[in-house]
Amino acid sequence: MARGNTMVPFGYEEEPPAQRGTLLVFETFEDWSEDEIGLIEAIADQRKFRKVVFYPQHEESLKRMGIPSASPYHKRVKLLEELLRDLPAERYTVDTWEGKRKKYTPVDTSLRFLTEKFASPYFVMMNDRYAAEFAGYKGFDEWIRKVRLLVWKRFGVPLPGKLLAYGERLDFIGEKGESVEV
């Protein structure tokens, strides 16, 4: 079996990839507009993400997490797809797996599904309310070692100490998309 050796000039160094990883955005997407999509687009360009996956959660999951949602799942997905229509589909996608399940899906189950489906490394973006809930889950310690968490300081929710203890795995983003300190 041929090995496929290639000749390269002395001192050749392979260029690092121009884009890296997948950004998984966990949100309700209920009150989103072009502004929020623009913010995500700017973050994706700045950090050079290869793929951005928007993951709206079913109302059963949101109810169990204690996160209010007035709109049904299918309306939020339709709104999100409408907002993303002008962006390149090969880079920006909406994953509707949770809508097919039509029931409560734990965050770690969703993360397991998404990490099996998309390329690594993984960056998970959540607002501060989601992140505070996620830090209280049993599987948080396992997942924070596998993903890097981008916490969007959107609602001013105080973050638990367990989350802040993993400061090297967290990045904080202000309301306008700028990097902020805790």
Predicted features, each with a name:
Residues M1-V182:
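Nucleotidyltransferase catalytic core that binds NTPs
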